[in-house]
Amino acid sequence: MCLVFIVNRQPFGGMKLSAFGGGVKAGGPNYCACLVKITDKPESNTDYKQSYPHAYEEEFAHARDINKLYGEQNAFRYLPLKNMVLRLFPGDSNEEAEMIALATKLCHTPLTISFDPNDDRTTALSSTGCTLKKETLDEFLKTMRSYERIRTCGADIPMEMYEEAARRNKYIATAKPVKNGRVELIHYIKEQSISFEFHRYGSILDVPPVE
């Protein structure tokens, strides 16, 4: 028997090693974003430096109880990742790296930017405030295990990265960075839902704060 639950009231999916993927819970507000490919329009004039902070404050910064049921609290919130690494390749632009750096900073997720010694980005990306590492692909593969999530600017990456990620149970976010913060910031957090009943035998207890 196969049971599939997609419940807005209590979005679910494990934490720690019981969860694999982008940290988005089934039935939650970002569930459908996992099922589609979202890219910027070529003529988009969205300013990511404005969109990202606005999206963080409006959507990602605060816990909330969407359904507000009497006697039951279903808190939904976003948590930062322990750490993340962005692996850059020669075809990736510095602007894409800067977009990702800003997004992780807003989400309080520590970011390391890794690139090949022959593709030195140290000067160009020094203003991001991120940890910068010059390392070959082989050297990078040996360090993948130490990051909670891996980010790239596209899916066209060496197969060795996918193989190492599979061995280490790591998720690689390969979507091309977009300027819309409501979409882009999903890559740099994980969701948590907590259900709590504050009634006993019909009597309502103290209503806990949503935090």
Predicted stretch roles:
Residues 1-211:
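C-terminal segments
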